[in-house]
Amino acid sequence: MSPQTETKASVGFKAGVKDYKLTYYTPDYETKDTDILAAFRVTPQPGVPPEEAGAAVAAESSTGTWTTVWTDGLTSLDRYKGRCYHIEPVAGEENQFIAYVAYPLDLFEEGSVTNMFTSIVGNVFGFKALRALRLEDLRIPTAYIKTFQGPPHGIQVERDKLNKYGRPLLGCTIKPKLGLSAKNYGRAVYECLRGGLDFTKDDENVNSQPFMRWRDRFLFCAEAIYKAQAETGEIKGHYLNATAGTCEEMIKRAVFARELGVPIVMHDYLTGGFTANTSLAHYCRDNGLLLHIHRAMHAVIDRQKNHGMHFRVLAKALRLSGGDHVHSGTVVGKLEGEREITLGFVDLLRDDFIEKDRSRGIYFTQDWVSLPGVLPVASGGIHVWHMPALTEIFGDDSVLQFGGGTLGHPWGNAPGAVANRVALEACVQARNEGRDLAREGNEIIREASKWSPELAAACEVWKEIKFEFEAMDTLD
């Protein structure tokens, strides 16, 4: 018997249920550079102290179970357990607390977002002692980051591939999202790209349905891309959605896209799953394909303020798993997104190093070391009048995506694309000349519309369209 085993055996085993806080609440713990740190918004059940609730989260998401077990004596719990090391009340909320938990790195498989989430946001979210639980943020240590490939290419490589610099990229989701034949779909793609857009996009639920099988769509879209490139002299792309029912089918679609020579494919990373997404990201890097990521299903997870997981965590997970673009909200359009919160996770997607900033919802300083950045995509209910605000909010390293705001133009798809391109170029020029886009935006668009009948028509159509609802998820 080894000395270590003798020591553990001599302690003895006492069956029964213990308070979690006796083992997992460690306020004196000093976090390590290699720890994964998590900030949970905890709402305990009545009568459950916050220390016990925070310790329960640490236990149930690491080594703990509901009772003492004799096999605890066969390992070093002190080495492997999660620790709740700090608890603070949430300002303005009754019986809500932020519980900070540190996890030792050895709890997680290298290069696996799937395994990381299975532990941290697994069974613990159904724990009866908690009325609600939300993961607000994660600090991923550099030692763990270095086990991931991350985005297939990143922002700079994408710009070099496209030969487009100094402005946001322009996109459009083809509408109606379902029901078009492959040929009519390809026609809409061609008209939008010819009109001046950089990208067009499959909607998230376009996969391979009876009205339009994936192979037919890929072929007609490739034809549209090459025709538009020949006529405009610009590199164009269409986000061909490779999402499928199996990983094998997904990769088959990506292989066909590569054989067609198109620059980019797409994946629904939450409905498709992180294992599938990471596999596709590896294929895309190895084969020179950019990867656009749609976040369909995110609001099921992140929209409620007291339960689920904040999108900033999903954004960090996507950067680890791999994607060159990801939808991030618009601040000004029809979909959820408060400005400071949105800009907080936009920086987490793009920048190499992000300081802790609670005013933007960032709970931890995050160093991404050499992991490439991800372009945020603003999409959903936006049109030409939003262009100055979008340019000012998101800056050059972004994709501005107008679906209805392109295809809803009264003169057709190509004029809709022209209107958006003229509006963007006018905003970029005005910004470069030192004008204030936030204050002078409408005037800049009106001036540009004098020289572009397409833009003037778009301005008239959408002059009264607004989406003025308060965001559900706001800063505390």
UniProtKB/Swiss-Prot annotation:
Keyword check for Disulfide bond: yes
Record-listed N6-carboxylysine modification sites: 201
Gene Ontology terms, MF aspect: magnesium ion binding; monooxygenase activity; ribulose-bisphosphate carboxylase activity
Propeptide residue span(s): 1-2
Keyword set, alphabetical order: Acetylation, Calvin cycle, Carbon dioxide fixation, Chloroplast, Disulfide bond, Lyase, Magnesium, Metal-binding, Methylation, Monooxygenase, Oxidoreductase, Photorespiration, Photosynthesis, Plastid
GO CC aspect terms: chloroplast
Subunit structure: Heterohexadecamer of 8 large chains and 8 small chains; disulfide-linked. The disulfide link is formed within the large subunit homodimers.
PANTHER family given in the database record: RIBULOSE BISPHOSPHATE CARBOXYLASE, RIBULOSE BISPHOSPHATE CARBOXYLASE LARGE CHAIN
Protein name: Ribulose bisphosphate carboxylase large chain
Gene: rbcL
